[in-house]
């Protein structure tokens, strides 16, 4: 197992592989330095910096659609994934390597969130865990929106990939997704002019499991998270030419944007000095019997 942690981009994982076989997705934009990030006037500047990688962290102000709230434009998926780690180091023992990072999203007269990030990477198995603690270091309550945008790419992702989620209900996000609801778990070859399809998954259990396996390369991945930490989970099915990716996205709210979430439901808010923990566990495997 090999993974690349990008200190300049929120200590996210920009590449993940097993036995030299790529499992993650690298978009056409490549690795973009945080200096070049801008939300742009339409709020979609994120897409010009969206390398995808295995995981892109999204938030803290917004996840999902760009929108305006109380006179401020919040861009697609927020900006935390484009903030460099202020401090990063590693420790290790006989069984694991731990990578620790601190990422600060602070502003004068604004929010002051600090992300304490820890990866625990096994030396004996093809597994790792990501643990995050977000702390409100400001003196006022601050809304928090958070998402792990995890991305599966070629050669793990092909028309021969098998895909499983232990959800009890699959809900299309929009009219385009309704067209593909019956095939939500079926992958197809890269297709010209394919329009993305997004599906929400709902669970009866606290432990969500998502798995992808491809017999052609005899590689698979299992991703687990706590549905109490992430009450929503979106599947992004994008089968386009050059934009060929399966996104698995545990999140704290629907992806309709900050203003809509505040209007329709109670948005997660951290009081001064309050913290919130999030985590995800990843297991890579060669044998489908481990499915």
Give a label for each model feature.
Residues 1-129, 141-143, 151-189, 201-291:
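Surface-exposed acidic/polar loop and edge beta-strand patches at domain peripheries
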Residues 195-197:
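C-terminal beta-strand-rich structural cap/linker in extracellular carbohydrate-active enzymes
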Residues 191-193:
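A general structural motif
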Residues 147:
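A short beta-loop-beta micro-motif enriched in histidine and acidic residues
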């Amino acid at each position: 197992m090999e993974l690349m942690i990008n200190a300049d981009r929120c200590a996210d994982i920009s590449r993940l592989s097993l036995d030299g076989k790529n499992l993650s997705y690298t978009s056409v934009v490549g690795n973009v330095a945080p200096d070049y990030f801008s939300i742009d006037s339409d709020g979609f500047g994120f897409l010009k910096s969206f390398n995808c990688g295995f995981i892109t962290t999204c938030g803290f102000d917004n996840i999902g659609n760009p929108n305006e709230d109380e006179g401020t434009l919040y861009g697609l998926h927020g900006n935390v994934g484009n903030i460099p780690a202020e401090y990063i180091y590693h420790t290790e023992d006989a069984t694991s390597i731990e990578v620790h990072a601190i990422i600060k999203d602070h502003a004068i007269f604004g929010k002051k969130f600090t992300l304490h990030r820890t990866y625990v990477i096994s030396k004996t198995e093809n597994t790792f865990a990501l643990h995050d603690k977000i702390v409100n270091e400001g003196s006022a309550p601050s809304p928090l929106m958070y998402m792990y945008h995890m991305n599966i790419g070629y050669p793990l992702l092909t028309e021969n990939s098998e895909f499983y989620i232990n959800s009890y209900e699959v809900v299309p996000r929009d009219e385009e997704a309704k067209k593909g609801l019956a095939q939500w778990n079926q992958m197809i070859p890269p297709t010209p002019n394919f329009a993305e399809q997004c599906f929400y998954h709902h669970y009866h259990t606290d432990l969500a499991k998502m798995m992808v396996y491809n017999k052609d390369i005899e590689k698979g991945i299992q991703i687990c998270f706590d549905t109490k930490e992430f009450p929503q989970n979106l599947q992004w099915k994008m089968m386009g030419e050059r934009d060929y990716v399966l996104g698995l996205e545990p999140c704290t709210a629907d992806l309709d944007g900050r203003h809509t979430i505040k209007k329709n439901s109670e948005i997660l808010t951290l009081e001064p000095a309050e913290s919130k923990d999030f985590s995800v566990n990843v297991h890579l495997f060669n044998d489908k019997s481990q499915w």
